[in-house]
Regions:
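Glycine-rich, flexible N-terminal cofactor/catalytic loop recognition
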Residues: 1-65
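Beta-strand/loop-alpha-helix module characteristic of Rossmann-like adenine-cofactor folds
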Residues: 8-9, 120-179
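Loop/turn-to-beta-strand initiation segments
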Residues: 9-11, 80-85, 161-162
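Short glycine-rich anion-binding loops that position phosphate/pyrophosphate groups of nucleotides
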Residues: 18-21, 89-93, 169-171
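Short active-site oxyanion
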Residues: 32-38, 111-113, 162-163
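Conserved helicase motor
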Residues: 61-68, 141-145
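Short phosphate-binding loop-to-helix
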Residues: 64-79, 98
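Short glycine-cluster motifs
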Residues: 80-139
């Protein structure tokens, strides 16, 4: 006998498409439609996704600018029995986004967390690169400060594993020139 999802008081960490809105699971869509509300990085981005699939659920902004204030409120909603879907603008929440703090706090206070897997930009880049993928390192975003960035790049150059990192489109050209 399978439990019906979503369950009350659960935090659902839901992977979202990273480029093609069709890259989402039926289970993820069911969760997004049936949780109490969706905590999302940018409501405009998430609105595009849920509108595409005819989902009419409340969106709550949860991003790097407001996460410090919102984590306690979201934890209280979960404790009161609400079910929440946490989504990122693209890919898996918590990978270089504020979802990490909510998940950490929910774990700390003993709440139930279920991950609904989905696309991950880092792994997608790795498997399509043709580079060795059995052992790799994920660095996330490089530091913005040049001296710290150079130090990190030097450390990366000393390992013999494929390294994945994120960089914003606006800083990518500058980074490539530094390399």
């Amino acid at each position: 006998h399978k439990k019906q999802e979503p369950e009350s008081g659960f935090l659902y960490v839901v992977g979202t498409p990273i480029g093609n809105l069709s890259d989402i699971s039926i289970r993820a869509l069911n969760i997004l439609e049936n949780v109490s509300f969706i905590a999302c990085e940018d409501t405009r981005q998430t609105q595009k996704l849920i509108k595409r699939y005819g989902i009419n659920n409340k969106l709550v902004s949860f991003n790097k600018h407001n996460s410090f204030k919102k984590v306690p409120n979201l934890i209280n909603f979960l404790k009161s029995g609400e079910s929440i879907a946490l989504v990122s603008d693209a890919g898996m929440p918590s990978i270089c986004d504020p979802g990490e703090e909510l998940i950490k706090e929910a774990k700390f206070v003993g709440l139930n967390i279920i991950c609904i897997p989905g696309p991950c930009a880092a792994i997608t880049a790795l498997v399509s690169s043709g580079l060795p993928s059995s052992k790799f390192i994920f660095e996330g975003f490089l530091p913005k400060k040049k001296s710290e960035r150079e130090k990190t790049l030097l450390e990366i150059s000393r390992n013999n594993r494929t390294t994945i990192l994120f960089e914003s489109p606006t800083r990518l050209k500058k980074l490539l020139n530094e390399l």
